């Protein structure tokens, strides 16, 4: 079966491609990407005004399985992902129970293999129960397919524990995905600290609560030779720190929420 997608804005950074082109798909595989394809096809779609890309990857999602299915589950979450052009999702470990062992990783992957509309990858916890007290079974989880590790929703407060995690994870070449905000500085804040928070009377979160956490994580990453990924960056100071870390050759990546 042949499918022809006409006049879409084809965008693929890996191929340095950003142009209005046609795509010919035959038996589920891309056969040609070019301007003005005239070959006959069983199905023809006019993608004028639309963007056509490889499947997007969302590295920070919450499928909420196991234990929190009232909020979301693998079926509903991956249906929403696929509808938005996302073909691979990585689900965070702050579930009930926390994804802190190999058997839970295997269970999620098995569940996803049976019922999902997108590829599902699993992020394991850095610490047992996300309590920040003892390292989780990161090695075992990596062998079972975990693509990274995070205490998502929690700052790894102990610098020693984080250092041990960073040194250990280099053996498995996986990123530590970090909720980088110092909770003592953030206190009970609900929004960025500034003129707006003061005017409307909502407790603000000072930007240094993020900046200090990001700086610590980058310094430890440099020391350990680990890859750290800073989640939901929200301050200019954190961006500046990440840029400087990259210039120094530290393996740091980052994301913002959309």
Named regions from a protein language model:
Residues 66, 92, 123-125, 152, ...:
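Structural motif
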Residues 59-72, 95, 121-134, 201-207:
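Active-site mouth loops of central-metabolism enzymes
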Residues 70-78, 130-140, 216:
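Short, acidic/polar
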Residues 1-39:
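N-terminal metal-binding scaffold of metallo-dependent hydrolase/deaminase domains
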Residues 50-115:
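Metal-associated gating/positioning segment near the N- to mid-region
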Residues 134-258:
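Histidine/acidic residue-rich metal-binding segments in metalloenzymes
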Residues 37-52:
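Active-site metal-binding motif and surrounding structural segment of the metallo-beta-lactamase
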Residues 8, 23, 28, 49, ...:
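Divalent metal-coordination and catalytic microenvironments
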């Amino acid at each position: 079966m042949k499918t022809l997608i006409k006049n879409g804005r084809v965008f693929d950074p890996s191929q340095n491609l950003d142009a209005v082109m046609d795509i010919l798909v035959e038996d589920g595989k891309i056969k040609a990407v070019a301007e003005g394809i005239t070959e006959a096809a069983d199905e023809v779609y006019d993608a004028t005004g639309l963007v056509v890309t490889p499947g997007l990857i969302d590295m920070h999602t919450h499928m909420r399985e196991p234990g929190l299915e009232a909020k979301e589950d693998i079926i509903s979450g991956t249906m929403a992902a696929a509808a938005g052009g996302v073909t691979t999702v990585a689900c965070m470990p702050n579930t009930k129970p926390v994804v802190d062992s190999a058997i839970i990783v295997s269970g999620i992957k098995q569940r996803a293999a049976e019922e999902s509309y997108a590829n599902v990858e699993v992020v394991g916890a850095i610490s047992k129960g996300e309590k920040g007290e003892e390292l989780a079974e990161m090695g075992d989880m990596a062998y079972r397919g975990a693509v990274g590790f995070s205490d998502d929703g929690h700052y790894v407060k102990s610098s020693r524990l984080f250092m041990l995690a960073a040194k250990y994870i280099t053996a498995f070449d996986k990123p530590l995905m970090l909720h980088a905000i110092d909770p003592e500085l953030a206190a009970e804040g609900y929004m960025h600290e500034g003129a707006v928070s003061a005017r409307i009377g909502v407790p603000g979160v000072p930007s240094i609560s993020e900046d200090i956490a990001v700086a610590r994580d980058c310094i430890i990453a440099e020391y350990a030779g680990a890859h750290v990924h800073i989640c939901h960056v929200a301050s200019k100071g954190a961006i500046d720190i990440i840029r400087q870390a990259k210039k120094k050759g530290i393996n740091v990546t980052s994301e913002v929420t959309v």
